[in-house]
Amino acid sequence: MKKTRLLKIVLFLLLLLIPVVYLVRLSIFPGFFADRPDAMYGHEAYRSEFSATDGTLLRGWFFNRGQGSPLVAVYTGNNMNVGGMLALALADMSRSYLMLNYRGYGDSEGVPSESRLVADARHCIAEARRRIGGQPSSLHIVGYSIGSGVANQVAAAESPATLTLICPFDSITEVACDFVPLLPRLLLPNTFVSTDFAPRITCPVTVLRAAADTLVTAPHTAALLRAYPTPPAEYVLQADHNSVFFLPEFIPLVLKSLEKGSFSGDLPTAAAGK
């Protein structure tokens, strides 16, 4: 009788764990849109291939604006080919843009994991610097959603001139708790704990938050903002998690953040302050 009861408890816990594992897996593993081939996004002249330290080929786009140009490294969200953010590089001819798909995303080889994504990002920044020819005048890092987790870890190690985060979170595990309360903290290791890395970041940080974001809700962004040694500039966009890119003010705001790390002067009216 006791064995039967214990078995039922174990099975119940396993059933509860399934949606938690599913949510965390969804946060980093590619889906339909990430599986889209790079050719769908065009701009063949800028298509590029970088080799990771283990030989895995990472593919995407490298907009090399020439020796001494600032370098912007862009990290996208889950279920997203980085080609979806090419408009940013096309709107800015003054900076070099490194926009590579994560392992297993787009045309990139391999299987993603948190440690591999961060290691790949740092290695490819070093290679991009070499290809530019001489040190870039500055390094700027942009991260969206899961890419904000990558961006925070890279920024803590690389000391960029600016860090721009779009729909960022405190940790994936904490976000998962919104969907399955408590269990992620009890049953899974924490992943992409951005609040652990934020205290090491000394460059200006700009955060663009979506007002109608139901995936990364405001408390998770607020918890991250509190972890930085200097309060970031925070702006709220009238969009949801997946539609921030389509706002006419999105690209101007990101480009503005690269100039100074925080905003001054007039802002698009749709972007409210803190």
Predicted regions and their residues:
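Catalytic histidine-centered segment of alpha/beta-hydrolase-like enzymes
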Residues: A239-F250
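Acidic catalytic loop of the alpha/beta-hydrolase fold
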Residues: A211-V216, H241-S243
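Short alpha-helix in the alpha/beta-hydrolase fold that links the catalytic acid
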Residues: S194, C203, T217-R226
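Gly/Ala-rich beta-loop-alpha elbow adjacent to hydrolase catalytic centers
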Residues: G143-G147, A151
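Membrane-embedded segments
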Residues: T53, L57-A128, G149
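Short beta-strand/loop motif that positions the catalytic acidic residue
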Residues: I201-T202, V207-D213
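An N-terminal hydrophobic leader/cap segment in hydrolases
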Residues: R5-F50
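Active-site nucleophile loop of the alpha/beta-hydrolase fold
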Residues: T164-E174, A239
